[in-house]
Amino acid sequence: MSRRSATSSGHPKVCACPSGLDPYRLPNHVAVIMDGNGRWAKARGLPRMVGHRAGVEALKRTLRLCSDWGIGALTAYAFSTENWSRPGDEVNFLMTLFERVLQRELESLEREKVRIRFLGDLEGLPSGLQELISEATELTVRNNGIHFNVCTNYGGRRELVLAAQKLAQRAARGDLDPTLIDENSFEAELLTAGEVDPDLLIRTSGERRISNFLLWQLAYAEIHVTDVCWPDFDEVALTKALFDYQSRCRRFGGLDPIAANHLGS
């Protein structure tokens, strides 16, 4: 089954998705909280670091599936501002892992026309990783395939505070009338500026919280929680999430059309 979707260049793209899914009702933007790497490893008697490596493979798999099925954007919560409180050896491992994976996968991302962006306090990352992030961003900025956003050293509250500070600074300089600040001007100062909000949030490992992730952008997202730990998140798990999404009636604060008709009769 094929789906025609517009890439960022405006050209239609023919995509295939699993049988039974409505190709015209897939989310344009999927966000994922990749939880359960440590639990996955512990259940197998393995070090947590093995779980993180397996999590990378799950992310590559998910990106490929989303791209193949015509989903326009994938945003992954890779490392939060709170994750610095983890043991130092684990944090160092993760930073090294990010560097190695980005070095290894950049050519493939470019070949597949993926546009990658890293969202967060990037200046707080190791200098080598910062350089790779700049290289990857510049190399893929004109790509017209799936938008791949990697939230690294990211915190939702911090993002909102920074956006408010930028608007306040503009107002203090006289460049902005405070009475004209609205949702659009606020969104323009967010790290995700220019990206559509997520339609679907997927959280793995059964946890039911959003963990300071995309606090503004997830306002109207549908939320799917699966007990599957992130390293085991595969095509079957993603398909279930999409079926769940398509079973919802998205109301954006309004009434279900059936309920609205009933009230009006």
Curated annotation (Swiss-Prot):
UniProt protein name: Isoprenyl transferase
InterPro entries tied to this protein: UPP_synth-like, UPP_synth-like_CS, UPP_synth-like_sf
Keywords: Magnesium, Metal-binding, Transferase
Source domain of life: Bacteria
Subunit relationships: Homodimer.
Active-site residues, record numbering mapped to chain: 35, 83
Any one GO BP annotation for this protein: polyprenol biosynthetic process
Function text: Catalyzes the condensation of isopentenyl diphosphate (IPP) with allylic pyrophosphates generating different type of terpenoids.
Organism: Prochlorococcus marinus (strain MIT 9313)
Residues annotated as binding Mg(2+): 35, 222
Name of the gene this protein is made from: uppS
Bound cofactor: record note: Binds 2 magnesium ions per subunit.
Family classification: Belongs to the UPP synthase family.
Co-factor(s): Mg(2+)
Top-level EC class as recorded in UniProt: transferase
Chain sites annotated for binding substrate: 36-40, 48, 52, 80-82, 84, 86, 203, 209-211
EC number in record: 2.5.1.-
Keyword presence, Transferase: yes
GO molecular function: ditrans,polycis-polyprenyl diphosphate synthase [(2E,6E)-farnesyl diphosphate specific] activity; magnesium ion binding
